[in-house]
């Protein structure tokens, strides 16, 4: 059996490398899963023969309490940027002035997250983010779930390597399709999705998403003589190395490589944002050294934002939650930075006037920050008889008169009952940074609003599972899950609720500062203007906005309705030792909670003075157990630790 287990480990690790390196595995997912299950069963039967590099070590159900800071033994430096051939030539002249014989290795600049992996005696000890280059975050448990990161090297060596963790384009599309179906906000791009994944506290989420890596640098002393030799040694150790690179002493050849890569960019299985050029010789790298911020022996050429021409077919005017009316151009479809673009923002009426944008114009389109399609300028020599774009005078949603205030560039609808604003306010209220009602995304809000089941935020808390099942595509399981998420949000600290109300100028930071000062929404509503304005970091604009809002009958009625519905209106983040019921206690959460999310339960416990731990020990004061509680509950019983349920927590 030991031989078969070894064979399965080697096969599964090989298939994982094929998948991530070539995006073309030699076996189907079904065959991989079959072999994986066979290995799992064998490891259950023969636990003494489990290999340290077994792929089963990657998958688990850890829920982390957070990420600890990690100080890098060797700092991660930034690279000097270049945006033109002239800047690359200047870099070449500087290098060749000292070392005429120098050659370069040029490799793809992966658009992901920089990571550092430290191995001790061949075993992965620490995986960390770059952070500020000196201190990052320890995300070892999450990186263990990335299948192409070796958990155990074939040699018992101490080694620290650097690389990029990224999300392949195919995985990105799959994840966004799932989020769309669940009514969740889609990720803007693969890099954001990768970043969000690596900061997940639930490692099961990380294991499910198919993150991948390219390793490209060794930190600290090395026996290799060149960057090329470093990459070759990485491949032998089982790391994924990007095969697309060249070595040349000629900047002409390097520039040709850059141009070739730029043409291939859209066809690659992953996002890149440039090409990194390094002096190949490690001895020359050491001689050239570093500036305060960057190595002198490397430079990163950044691709310019891709631009395409398209015709403006029409312009839509949409209303946001604050009443701002934003113009968006409908375009003839063009391929831009790997996606089909048929719409682009025109920002505001002043921007339209400044650029003299008209229906039928041929315009240059680009992606601002490689994310948001926008119109750069009009191609005037292609203009024919186009007439200036008519600017709306009434709201496209409610037909109320639009206002263009002197101190603003935007048109604004000031009707508080505007349907478009109401829907956007509901979406904002349920969003992650506000009440974080998982599953209540734009698509579900639209259905609920159209069905006249909700009109304002208080209506959300009158919904029942039966109401939710009236919606097309919502079955009992989904309805129950969303209902529980709505109920769980009632326990949020008041700064979340304040931000969710969408009061003009009151962002998440201001909401926290206000709640730290006044401790409840009711106290804030009754507060003096001067007391609000005196808070460091706020001022008279926010004070005026709050006083105006809370003076309205609608706001006063809403507070009463939310309190009646059972929402917490107090700040939970500033309990003192004297009034914190659980001060000094170490509490462990285990199992699935019915009404609270794990983060909400943790937040409530901490607000009551408890220290929330991730594992049970003799120091544990009590364990709160939900359904399907496992080994933590059993250990607590063995140690004689007090056990409570979710109802006890909710009663506090």
UniProtKB/Swiss-Prot annotation:
Its cofactor is Mg(2+); Mn(2+). One of its GO terms (cellular component) is cytosol. The keyword Ligase applies. Its EC number is 6.5.1.2. InterPro entries: BRCT_dom, BRCT_dom_sf, DisA/LigA_HHH, DNA_ligase, DNA_ligase_AS, DNA_ligase_CS, DNAligase_adenylation, DNAligase_N. The active site is at 109 (n6-amp-lysine intermediate). GO terms for biological process: DNA repair; DNA replication. It is an enzyme of class 6 (ligase). DNA ligase that catalyzes the formation of phosphodiester linkages between 5'-phosphoryl and 3'-hydroxyl groups in double-stranded DNA using NAD as a coenzyme and as the energy source for the reaction. It is essential for DNA replication and repair of damaged DNA. Belongs to the NAD-dependent DNA ligase family. LigA subfamily. This is DNA ligase. It comes from Streptococcus mutans serotype c (strain ATCC 700610 / UA159).
